[in-house]
Amino acid sequence: MANQKIRIRLKAYDYALIDRSAQEIVETAKRTGAVVKGPIPLPTKIERFNILRSPHVNKTSREQLEIRTHLRLMDIVDWTDKTTDALMKLDLPAGVDVEIKVQ
């Protein structure tokens, strides 16, 4: 489409899963003749939590946990209807959150 691009943002806790999904999207888009910019790795969001190990005493003994959220960004330019149909039929793993915007 003229002067429009598809922006795809992937979010997952497992970096291997998100990289595999991004590679699938890139291969599918290139197979249909679209131009793909990316995947661009965005900064990893790290959430850290401290919880008490003991339910009663020992306040100084704590467990430290963290959740890492990995992000990837891709832009698909010069796309056709064939590209959108192929992307809609693409089956991605359940652990990957996909956000698609047409700009």
From Swiss-Prot:
User: Which segment of the chain is annotated as a signal peptide?
Assistant: none
Query: Its Gene Ontology molecular function terms?
Result: structural constituent of ribosome; tRNA binding
Could you tell me which Pfam families the record lists for this protein? Ribosomal_S10
Record GO biological process: translation
**Keyword set, alphabetical order:** Ribonucleoprotein, Ribosomal protein
Give the intrachain disulfide bonds: none
* PROSITE patterns given in the database record: RIBOSOMAL_S10 (PS00361)
Q: What Gene Ontology cellular component terms go with this record? A: ribonucleoprotein complex; ribosome
**So what does this one do?**
Involved in the binding of tRNA to the ribosomes.
Q: Which HAMAP family match?
A: Ribosomal_uS10
How is the subunit organization of this protein annotated in UniProt? Part of the 30S ribosomal subunit.
Family assignment from sequence similarity: Belongs to the universal ribosomal protein uS10 family.
Name of the protein described by the UniProt record: Small ribosomal subunit protein uS10
Instruction: Specify the species.
Output: Neisseria gonorrhoeae (strain ATCC 700825 / FA 1090)
